[in-house]
Amino acid sequence: MQPSHINLYQRPATKNLFRYRNKVNGSKIMNILSVGECMAEFSPDARNGKFNLGFAGDTFNTAWYIANNHSDVNSAYFSKVGDDELSSQMLKFMSDNRVDTRYIKEIPDSTIGLYLITLANGERTFSYWRNNSAATFLGQNSIDVEIAMEKQDMVYFSGITLAILDSHSRKTLFSCLRMARDAGKKIAFDPNLRPKLWKDKKEMCDVIMAGANLSDIILPSFEDEATWFFDADPISTLKRYQNAGADTVVVKNAGKPISFFSQQGIGTVPIDPVGKLIDSTAAGDSFNSEVLVGLLRKISLTEAINNGAQLAKKVIMGQGALVKSNV
């Protein structure tokens, strides 16, 4: 699959498609768009040693938890897929789980990325095949991105979303996020630092902060921020992202208290002890889903954080990235 094979992208004159949204939105349904890559997952079955096919990916996991736990929220996903059977299976899986797929575009002669999970002494390791996957071209056409964002109340993306894109697609996404924010959409961002996806540390940190500059809500993980931005403590992380322009920052910190910044000030929320840890794969993604929905509903930030922590606690006591659980 090479970009030269794709002839889908004609670029009509760009206009701001977002500006009329607030004047016509009489619906009680809230709309959240998650942007990124969903991949095919092959995970081992401990009972027979065979591999099971599933679908997951950081921003998709969040979209899935929103769709499965909140009937009053339309959880849409924006990405690109191929025209093969595996892509079709993934789209069906999304639709079957109430994720709105109307904005996902198909690229001929392409396929989706995939990853393989292997287990050794209870530890999970991941092998990825995602270079030139269809999702890496999600920012090629600005009109596709604008249309996807037009009817949303909130747009959510991550550092992994940014990492898989080339510089042109990244600039397109940034431009569309800026227009959406100017039109009153809330922009939410999980930095989700994954150095293996980047050319080098400097590129990763520079692009992450560029994404933060466009965001209202930022949901970092302290362990990553301490490693790559050398933050001494969660308050340092809060202040750095506050200075980038966010009005809400929530710092996840494994099982330790969660720190937050909002217009009401800085605070912490203690976390209940976790029972038996089975699989922490989507702890942060599930947590994010409850915080984002809570902020859209305008409940208190501490209540939203508590809801997120309770869901994440259930998720890590289940198996896999997507765990059915009523919140």
Range-by-range predicted roles:
Residues M1-I29:
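N-terminal amphipathic/basic-hydrophobic helices that include classical n-h-c signal peptides
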Residues Y20-N97:
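Glycine-rich phosphate/adenosyl-contacting loop at the front of the ribokinase-like
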Residues N25-L33, M179, A232-V327:
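Conserved phosphate-binding/catalytic region of the ribokinase-like
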Residues C38, I160, P191, S286:
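Active-site metal-binding loops of divalent metal-dependent hydrolases
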Residues N74-I160:
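Conserved N-terminal subdomain of the carbohydrate kinase-like
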Residues L162-R170, W198-K199, F229-F230:
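Glycine/threonine-rich flexible loop motifs
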Residues A183, P195-I266:
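Conserved phosphate/ATP/ADP-binding segment of small-molecule kinases
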